[in-house]
Curated annotation (Swiss-Prot):
HAMAP family: Ribosomal_uS12_A. GO terms for biological process: translation. The gene is rps12. With S4 and S5 plays an important role in translational accuracy. Located at the interface of the 30S and 50S subunits. NCBIfam families: PRK04211.1, uS12_E_A. Part of the 30S ribosomal subunit. Belongs to the universal ribosomal protein uS12 family. Gene3D superfamilies: Nucleic acid-binding proteins (2.40.50.140). GO terms for cellular component: small ribosomal subunit. One of its GO terms (molecular function) is structural constituent of ribosome. Pfam families: Ribosom_S12_S23. This is Small ribosomal subunit protein uS12.
C-alpha cells in the first residue's frame, strides 16, 4: 500500500497509464472525428458521382447496389448503400442525396457489404423508402 500522502502520485500514474488505452487516446485527441468523412455529424448531403455494384462477402453471393457520393461539405468521396428492392433505379448521377450511417457495429460496415459504412436516405429531398414503396414519385429537377 502507498503512503498516507500518496494520492497525487496515484492520480498522476492513473492519468499517465490512461494514454495506453486506445479508446481513451482516440477520444481525447479527437482522432475518430478527424478520420470521419462526415466530421462527427449524423448526416451529410452529397452529389452522386456514379453507381457501383459491390460483391457481398462469403458465403453470400450477390451484387449490392451502391453509389459513389462526393460530400458537399468537404469534397470527400464515400460509397453509400442504396437500401430497398429496386432503390438504385430512383438514383441517377448528379442527384443530391442525403447520407447517414448504415448502423453496423461500432459505426462500421454492416452485414455482408465490405467497406460500406453509409446508406442513402433521401434523393433530391424525398425519402428513398417512400419512393421504393411507391407512395411518392421522384421529383423532376
Amino acid at each position: 500500500m502507498p503512503g498516507l500522502f500518496a494520492a497525487k502520485k496515484l492520480k498522476d500514474n492513473r492519468q499517465n497509464f490512461r494514454w495506453k488505452d486506445t479508446q481513451y487516446k482516440r477520444k481525447t485527441l479527437g482522432l475518430n472525428i478527424k478520420a470521419d468523412p462526415l466530421e462527427g455529424s449524423p448526416q451529410a448531403r452529397g452529389i452522386v458521382i456514379e453507381k457501383v455494384g459491390i460483391e457481398a462477402k462469403q458465403p453470400n453471393s450477390a451484387i449490392r447496389k451502391c453509389v459513389r457520393v462526393q460530400l458537399i461539405k468537404n469534397g470527400k468521396q464515400i460509397t453509400a448503400f442504396a437500401p430497398g428492392d429496386g432503390a438504385i433505379g430512383f438514383i441517377d448521377e448528379h442527384d443530391e442525396v442525403m447520407i447517414e450511417g448504415i448502423g453496423g457495429p461500432s459505426g462500421r460496415s454492416m452485414g455482408d457489404i465490405p467497406g460500406v459504412r453509409w446508406k442513402v436516405t433521401k434523393v433530391n429531398n424525398v425519402a428513398l423508402s417512400e419512393m421504393v414503396s411507391g407512395k411518392i414519385e421522384k421529383p423532376v429537377r
